[in-house]
From Swiss-Prot:
The gene is nuoN. This is NADH-quinone oxidoreductase subunit N. GO terms for biological process: ATP synthesis coupled electron transport. Belongs to the complex I subunit 2 family. NDH-1 is composed of 13 different subunits. Subunits NuoA, H, J, K, L, M, N constitute the membrane sector of the complex. NDH-1 shuttles electrons from NADH, via FMN and iron-sulfur (Fe-S) centers, to quinones in the respiratory chain. The immediate electron acceptor for the enzyme in this species is believed to be ubiquinone. Couples the redox reaction to proton translocation (for every two electrons transferred, four hydrogen ions are translocated across the cytoplasmic membrane), and thus conserves the redox energy in a proton gradient. It catalyses: a quinone + NADH + 5 H(+)(in) = a quinol + NAD(+) + 4 H(+)(out). It is found in: Cell inner membrane. InterPro entries: NADH-Q_OxRdtase_suN/2, ND/Mrp_TM. Its EC number is 7.1.1.-.
Amino acid sequence: MTITPQHLIALLPLLIVGLTVVVVMLSIAWRRNHFLNATLSVIGLNAALVSLWFVGQAGAMDVTPLMRVDGFAMLYTGLVLLASLATCTFAYPWLEGYNDNQEEFYLLVLIASLGGILLANANHLAALFLGIELISLPLFGLIGYAFRQKRSLEASIKYTILSAAASSFLLFGMALVYAQSGNLSFEALGKSLGDGMLHEPLLLAGFGLMIVGLGFKLSLVPFHLWTPDVYQGAPAPVSTFLATASKIAIFGVVMRLFLYAPVGDSEAVRVVLGIIAFASIIFGNLMALSQTNIKRLLGYSSISHLGYLLVALIVLQSGEMSMEAVGVYLAGYLFSSLGAFGVVSLMSSPFRGPDADSLYSYRGLFWHRPVLAAVMTVMMLSLAGIPMTLGFIGKFYVLAVGVQASLWWLVAAVVVGSAIGLYYYLRVAVSLYLHAPQQPGRDAPTNWQYSAGGIVVLISALLVLVLGVWPQPLISLVQLAMPLM
């Protein structure tokens, strides 16, 4: 296949981030300068975001059999780039107090972003696997970046071993799918399944193994055991990336796979996914109830949020509303998580050992950092799905598609899970307004709102509130991505 200038335009975000990786690598070799390398990384990610406009002008097209660039890919590429940009922004003040190598952090985030963009554009199981590995391998280093702390190193080892096992399941599943269908392309798989091959035992076994591998990456029950330990052990900016960019990119490619290859048409697959969704919603929320560590709480919370999204994925073939639901929910989850983890990052910066992730550290925050406490409150309310926030719009969409498909047991799980979640999210919010302890612990800088990280947190809070009241711009953007598929 000949690569034309149109193809190069379509690949601009991938090429720009790839070029930024090379530039930052050479910059580190030439001169170790934290500010310079952080600036180069942020410029590269911003340039990749701007390039999406030119990609949109080029229109939808296949770039090699591995990738398809369309509205769907642009939407998820944009979300991954926003999450990566926020991660770099939160990392800069955190790394200012870090005495070991600082610059490699940005290099690893850029490489992981490259994997996320590849996943957003993937149209082939080979591209899916390459993207997942490209996003996972840098995370091994990022999670253990504060390697002098036992908890960070332990989290990195856990994630590395379990991620390798999950990748093995995923690869073996792909091998079985290829053995039965003779194809790895999403579209070709769709044709094979349409020819009545969906109920072949070998194919179902292959998809079953793939669900195990992808379930681990998405922290779905029962493949979730790594999540709270890794969220707690990883540095706060890394937890931000794990909770947002990594999950969004992988869920995006799973959604495309289900669109082209209607795996959900199999009753067996639908039942298995339904049970996983139900268990993730209930277990994630129940386990979060007793947590006193905010990062662990958000880790268990992410399990339940992916369970909610799985409800929309199960009914993906039934109409466009489920695609819309996933897009809106992921955008709400992105901004809410960026705000919540952003506050934790600001409270933990500069690096002084363990992060400020204990609930006790936030007790009485309102009385000396009122705006920061207000931001954290908005994020907790959005994650809980309270009306007038973007989180409510996403949860309402999920309930609507569940009702439309008559999945009453999953609708009940969403309602019960949301009620349970309300308790622990409000527990965090209420602690912000209690009397401050006699011996205050960690605190955010006095001028936090003027820092780049503070601006990102404030913008996230503003978007959560504005789009919660007036969601039409976001809904229109998500709808715009759908016809180009």
